[in-house]
Each structure stands twice: as structure tokens, then as C-alpha cells.
Amino acid sequence: MRAERVVDGDTFVTSSGSIVRLIGINAPERGRPFYLESKNALKALIEGRLVELDADVQDRDDYGRLLSYAYVGGEMVNARMIEDGFANVFTLPPNLRFAELFLSLERDAIKNGKGLWASSAVTGVKIAGQHFDAREYDEENLNDEYLIISNENDFAFDLTRFLLRDQAGHEFVLSLILPANGEVMVRTGSGVNDNSNYYLGCDDPVWNNDYETAYLWDDEGKLVDLFIFDRGNQHPNP
């Protein structure tokens, strides 16, 4: 079949009318930094061309879209989008056949500052740790699900309009100031912000307890830091 029309950097429509969601990757949504670059990259790879689709454990998502690895001329499009920095890895069990490959490609793209991973001029601001698996039930203890953002500078740092995102694409525009040589716990639930705690105001858990990546972008859409969590193995920015 042919790829008839690209929707965004991780979704396209086939000549038969099927909507295909590429497995293992996530691209910026409309209106977000790098949306057009990502969409155009996928268009250049597949639009109007013959594609071969290959499923994993699940063949459709909750929206009825086909979940697939897409191949054009023998090349896997999912992997190419990650390799070139036009999408981030989206690890979602049980569709994990190429998870390790995708993570390796993403690490290389980050090291080389490709696409999404162009480095910010911001220094000294880090995602320093996480507690994604709250005590008892996550849904009943949202404020025990948190990550830590630290400031290694000798001055307070304004993160207003910085973007915090998980690998699934949940986005939070921040409005907080990091204290000099301090840190802030960014908690999922609601509360009163202070010098040590910042609340996202969510009604449901955000961070995946098994596989997750937290990304922090500056107000120009440049990557400040990321934090990878994989079944208890924590990896700062590679």
C-alpha cells in the first residue's frame, strides 16, 4: 500500500484510508516547537511511496489506529525518525520488539544534537532525580509522584515558559523559579507552590512506573536536560 498523507511526525494515512501510528516513537504535536520539521521529515520519507507495515504484540491502539513498524525500500521509518532526531522514543509495553534499538539511536541523536536535541544555552539546570512510583496507589497519592529539578548556579533561575514533557507527549508549561544552588520537587497533583515544591495540578498520574523519559526544554524549544527511567535504572542525560 501507499502512504497517502502524513498527519504529523508519527502518524500517516494509507491509500486504503487506514490511519497508521508508528510504534515506539512520539513526535511534537501541532503548535509545539519542531512540529513542522518532524512532519516534513516523515513526508520526505514516506508520502506517496509504497510502505510495508509490520505489527508488534498489539495491532491497534485505543483510537483504532494501526500500530506498525513501517518500511520503505527495506528501511524502517520508525528508526530513521529517531536516528535523525525528528521524534523521541515512546516505550509502551507490550510493543517492545525494537525498544533497545530505538533507545540506542536516541542516545546517539542526543549526543550529536540532532533535530529535537539541539542543546540549550542554559547551564546548571538538571533533572536530578525522580519518584515516579508513589507509595500505595499512584492515583490516590499524586503528590508522592514527582521529579526533582536542580539548579547548580549561584543565582536563582527562572523557568517560566520552559516545557516539561513525558515520553507519551504530556506537556506542562512551567512557571517557577529555582532557588540558587537548590532544587524543586515537581509534584503531579495539586497544592500551593513554594520554594521547594511545584504542583502540576493533574487529576491522574503522569509518569510511567516502568519505562519513562522526562524532558525539559527551554522557552526557545531547545533541550535543557532529560532523565531516563527504565525499571528502576535511572540514567541522567546521555
Residue ranges and their predicted role:
Residues 1-238:
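Small beta-barrel nucleic-acid-binding modules, primarily SNase/OB-fold domains
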